[in-house]
């Protein structure tokens, strides 16, 4: 039997997931905007217009064996995030599991931001959460919904905690080449591996409640910026300590908490399950971006 996967909020990672799965699975991408629908169609799989906060519109989405909830709040504040990540997720779960042919499982795409600050120490799936902004508190709440709500209907839910996403259109070279670069750790995962890890969870039938999705090598921001400058054959960028950055009077409280957050995320569990990274470290993942920069 060919499984059908419905990707709710089929954006940056969802489009890549659909491209990876379309050869062996029936894939449906769900967005609410014209541009979103066009992007799904361009990626080569079925597009359906619906809104996760509107159960009536979700009726247009066909039955699916697997659900991936990757909707975005569009960079807005905590209340907008709650509407999508918590209420929208709850609405989608209740809608699909009320059908005569409900899904088997759900994967919700979360963020390593739920850990908060660990002063550069390692964190893994067993580390207690300590969200320090309104939005990351919402993400932690959404994880609980993703794990618990499907179980109430006899299904299974998982949360895939993505580290900082990068890849096509998101290399952000100027940020690190021009600086100033603030101290702290970077935890990253290439878009291909963020999508690949979700595909792996679904296709291999792994039923982890929570899984960290991050590459092999957390790196200090200063070291990464210097490596990138060296590869691009430009001068090393200016740097700031955390204290120097926090002295900026224009920072919001949310920005200050983000700057003070430092941790190293472990992918040991994902590796133990057998996932093979396409881009194990930033050195692999930034190769094409560096080549393009040097050619220009």
Where are these regions (language model features)?
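Conserved Rossmann-fold NAD(P)-dependent oxidoreductase catalytic core, especially the SDR/UDP-sugar
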Residues: 91-133
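C-terminal amphipathic/interface module of NAD(P)-dependent oxidoreductases
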Residues: 50, 55, 256-296
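Substrate-positioning beta->alpha
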Residues: 159-161, 180-202
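Glycine/proline-rich active-site loop of Rossmann-fold NAD(P)-dependent oxidoreductases
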Residues: 137-140, 167-177, 200-211, 217, ...
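Mid/C-terminal beta-alpha module of Rossmann-like enzyme folds, strongest
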Residues: 197, 204-258, 266
